[in-house]
Every structure is written in C-alpha cells, then in structure tokens.
Amino acid sequence: MTGSGPSTKKPALPSKPRSGPSAVPLRSVRGGAWVAIDTNILIYANQRRSPECVAFLERCASGELQGVVPLPMVAELVHALMLIEARENNWIERANPARSLSERPDLVRRLSRYEARMREFFAIGLRIEALGAADVIEAIRIQRETGLLTNDALLLAAARRLNCEAVATADKAIARASGFKVYAPADL
C-alpha cells in the first residue's frame, strides 16, 4: 500500500546534525510532518503497551501526519506479530522463539491472528516504502558513521532519501544518530 509521496518542494535534510543525542517526545511531532516509522512504534501500538504510540498512529491515520514505513520494518512487524501470536498460544519457548517456531512449520501454518493485525496495519494508510540498492549503500555509510545495525540504518537511509523531517522510534541507538530529528514515546 503506498500513498502519495512528500512534496518535491520539501528541503533536503541538512548535512549537519539537527538534533542532539536524545529523542523528543513522540507526541511533539508537528502536524503535516513526514515521519519515518520504526517497527517498535508499530508493535507498541499494536500491543497497546504505549498510549502515545497508539495516538501517534491515530494521527497518521487521520492524515495529520504522513507516516512512512520502509519495507524492512514491515517485514520485521510481520515476523514479530507471528512470534507474539505463537507466544500467546504457548507454542514456543522464550530462549530462541524464532528457532522454535521455524522447527514447527505445522504451527506456522496454524497462525492466523497476525494476518488480521497486518491487515489492520495496512488499513491505517501509511506509506509503505520499498528500498533499493542506493538505500542499502546509504545504510552501509550510516552504519560506518553510527555503528547502527542494518535495519536501523535502512530506516535512516529511507528517511534521508524521502526527506522525512522526523523519525519515530523507541530505539535509543537511533536517537543518538546525528542528522535526524528523532521522536520517541515518553510513556515506555
């Protein structure tokens, strides 16, 4: 599901840091902003662990904010929701839940709630953004500068390419990356 992109009139991200080494409260994102959204925000909202994340996604759904979710974050969300459902069913152990589930394809085939949750996610109307080779190269450059792991760097590479003025995440490592205005839920 894709929406219309940010205006070509938006200014490019500056090369100098716009934010300090900490995040701003998620509720402070200004109306009309284009926001790259990390998986953890989606999970906290889905699991109702953060009313601030729920309210943030409601702002995106209403069109007040323009939420962008890079495809790797969508894949992470699917994976996380599968594991959450399997845990709720008491089908997997906590030690290595992904391995436990991968060894039981019969259980994977029986999972169903995560699909409904993904359909609800897509119905919000967030822009799902595919990534290309240039994004991967940019993510590697970001990794060299910041020490972030791959998917975190991909989130920032997409945010930079799309000129998103904000990044929504609960990840403190991302909040320390320079050159990005990072917003985090204050209720976690």
Sequence positions of predicted segments:
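Mobile, glycine- and charge-enriched loop segments
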Residues: 59-67, 71-75, 80-85, 93, ...
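Short, well-structured N-terminal submotif of metal-dependent ribonuclease cores
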Residues: 2-73, 80-96, 188
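Acidic active-site catalytic centers that drive phospho-/nucleotidyl reactions
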Residues: 38-40, 152, 171
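Active-site neighborhoods of divalent-metal-dependent phosphate/nucleic-acid chemistry enzymes
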Residues: 2-14, 20-26, 112-166
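A residue-level structural signature of the nucleotidyltransferase/glycosyltransferase Rossmann-like core
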Residues: 34, 66, 128, 166-167
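Hydrophobic/aromatic ligand-binding patch that stacks against planar heteroaromatic rings
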Residues: 59, 158, 174
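Short loop/helix-cap segments at secondary-structure boundaries that form the rim of catalytic
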Residues: 173-180
